[in-house]
Amino acid sequence: MVTVTQLQPGDVAHVDRYLPLNRLDQQRAEGSTYLVAWDDEQPIAHAHIAWVGTHLGVPEIQDVFVVPERRRRGIAAQLTDAAEQEARARGWDSISLSVSQDGNVAARQLYAKLGYADAGVDPVRVSGSIMLRGRPFEVDDSLLYLVKPL
């Protein structure tokens, strides 16, 4: 059975061996929350919720990642639901996320099924080198922002 919990400081080393915790520094600064999906003691997926500094000014689900062998089993939907519940618990009435405008058709289909709609803003082009956990990472993509009322 898969369960979703907030990433706790004591779990970081264990989870980091299996999943790319790209935005861990933001959680440490208390501007975000990592959710981790577990199958028994094994971390199999995560999602990041940014609470401040987001493009639409509402919480933003970012960096949803499910290990390849566990995809298409509802785990991303479970993580998204947990993020929505956390946003509701904090008093928010909507939540957002972004997805590649030209790629990741499966993710766009999932988010539409879960009730996310185009936020009505122009896609945002991201390109260049950014630092993630002390390492450079090259990005080149256009992001489509989606939003869902809670």
Task: Spell out what each predicted region is.
Residues A87-S100:
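Conserved GNAT acetyl-CoA-binding A-motif
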Residues Y111-V121:
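Conserved acetyl-CoA-binding loop of GNAT-fold acetyltransferases
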Residues L97-A107, P123-S129, F137:
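Conserved beta-strand-loop-alpha-helix junction that forms the acyl-donor binding cleft
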Residues V64-R71, V99-Q101:
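A short, internal acetyl-CoA/4′-phosphopantetheine-binding micro-motif in the GNAT/acyltransferase core
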Residues V124-L150:
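Terminal substrate-recognition subdomain of acyl/acetyltransferases
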Residues V66, R72-Q85, A89, R108-K113:
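Conserved acetyl-CoA-binding loop-helix of GNAT-fold acetyltransferases
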Residues V2-P68, T80-D81, E86, D122, ...:
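Acetyl-CoA-dependent GNAT
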